[in-house]
Amino acid sequence: MSSSSKASASSSLSSTATSSTSATRGSDGCVVCDSTASCPVCASGEYCVMTSLTCDKCPSTYCAKQSDSQLSSLSSSSSSSSSSNSNEKTSLIVGFTVGIVGGAMLIALVALYFINKRYWKPKRQKNKALKLEEASQSYGNEEEYFDDEDDDDEDDEDDGGMRKDESHTLFNTSLVPPTLNVPGNRSSASTTRTRASNILPIAYIPGVTSGLSTDKLQSKLRSSSKRQNAAGDIRSHITLGSSILDGLDDEDDEHNQVLNKDADDNLITAIRAKPKLVQIAEEESDKEIQDLDVIEEQTEADDLSHMAKSEASHGNNDEDDDEEGSFILDLEIPESIRESTQGSRTESPFEDKFEIHDER
């Protein structure tokens, strides 16, 4: 410390001492300070120091020289404060910059979305529709691919639904790919809108095959019909087999049981016939024609004997044949007609044009 500072310090201390001794004391016995102490003007490298207030002494100030440790602490504190201030400023600048950039990007994205929705998207759709329309026109008229040529007039509900689908398809033709309107796909579109089928239902009817030629067979049938339809050989019975009347008998079974109780006198006597199928070998020869003549003669004799037996047993079998599924009509031919038609061919309304008898 310099001599001047020491002198000033000593003078200040002496003055404070004299002031403290000369100062008045209060009721508590402590000195009463009249004014606050003020720091003097210190030289470079010095700092102002104030003493503490005690009961016997008022505070005093003086200049003291700064030490190296105090200077380093002051410099470090000042540097730390300045660095903290700079860090705060940097963080503020970075945050402000990020906020500005993020806000600008958000505004740009929103603007692009609205521009795309209002201008760019309708323009792209319009260009696409024009291209598809040009492509569809290059394949021909569009309306001919949607003609509904339905032959089924009863399916009106489906036709109405198809008309709705057709109108909807025509309305959205610009949005449909052009490959759907190609003429090659027309057949598939027409088949899906109709109930037509490519399958023809054919019922199998079992028949009798014959190896005889048409001319020979017709000549044999004519000769057999001439022999069978003589004046005295007119048939007086018609027999309907059970294969024809079985369906009706099954449906009316319960109804007939009720009627049988009240109408026993109106019952019809019937006999049941059993149909047979005969297969003729497919061989064209004169021997078969001769065999056919022999068979026809035998069957004629059998028919005559069978008719005689049936007429004899007809009266005895009325009660036994009440539940059968066929009936017999008895026709009486006057003798005058029989005598007048002898020697001539008479056609019967019940004539069997084609008969095939079982081989015995």
From Swiss-Prot:
Keyword entries, A-Z: Cell membrane, Glycoprotein, Membrane, Phosphoprotein, Transmembrane, Transmembrane helix, Vacuole
Membrane topology, from the record: Single-pass membrane protein
Protein name: Protein OPY2
Single GO cellular component term: endoplasmic reticulum
Region (STE50-binding): 266-345
Phosphoserine modified-residue sites: 285, 348
Sequence intervals crossing the membrane: 92-112
Compositionally biased residues, Basic and acidic residues: 303-312, 348-360
Acidic residues composition-biased segments: 141-159, 282-302
Organism: Saccharomyces cerevisiae (strain ATCC 204508 / S288c)
GO BP term, example: protein localization to plasma membrane
Glycosylation sites: 172, 185
Annotated spans, Disordered: 1-28, 130-193, 282-360
Classification via Pfam families: Opy2
Record field: compositional bias (Low complexity): 1-24
Note: Present with 1160 molecules/cell in log phase SD medium.
Principal location listed in the UniProt entry: membrane
